[in-house]
């Protein structure tokens, strides 16, 4: 089963995302900030990463850029899932290396559909 890394500082958001993804057979791991997300991605080589932006320490933009520039992780698809919904935020996220951008609130069904579409591509 594919492994999905969730990088988000909200335990509630992480719980909802993990529950939805695991219900559909995905394995999940979670990180509470960008630095931990980068470390786990390098160690675990997940099949997909859902990345929040606003987190303490290393934010999601910085973590995405770090992963996109690291040989072992540059091919892992990263989808930003965040409350920052301005067009400039979306463009900046994509320019850092994300392949897609979802604005919260995101329903569990939409999250699972996005994972399925990304991993089957």
What are the roles of these predicted feature ranges?
Residues 15-23:
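Charged docking surfaces used in two-component/phosphorelay signaling
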Residues 44-50:
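Active-site beta3 strand of CheY-like receiver
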Residues 55:
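Receiver (REC) domain active-site loop signature in two-component systems and cognate sites
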Residues 99:
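Short, glycine/charged-rich "phosphate-handling" switch motifs in NTP-dependent
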Residues 106-116:
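C-terminal output helix
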């Amino acid at each position: 089963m594919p492994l999905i890394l969730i990088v988000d500082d909200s335990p509630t958001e992480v719980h909802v995302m993990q529950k939805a993804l695991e219900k559909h057979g995905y394995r999940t791991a979670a990180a509470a900030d960008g630095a931990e997300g980068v470390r786990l991605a390098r160690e675990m080589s997940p099949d997909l990463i859902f990345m929040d932006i606003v987190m303490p320490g290393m934010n999601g933009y910085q973590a995405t850029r770090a992963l996109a520039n690291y040989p072992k992780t540059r091919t892992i698809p990263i989808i930003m899932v965040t409350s920052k919904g301005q067009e400039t935020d979306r463009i900046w996220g994509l320019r850092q290396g994300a392949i897609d951008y979802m604005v919260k609130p995101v329903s569990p069904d939409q999250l699972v559909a996005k994972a399925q579409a990304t991993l089957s591509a």
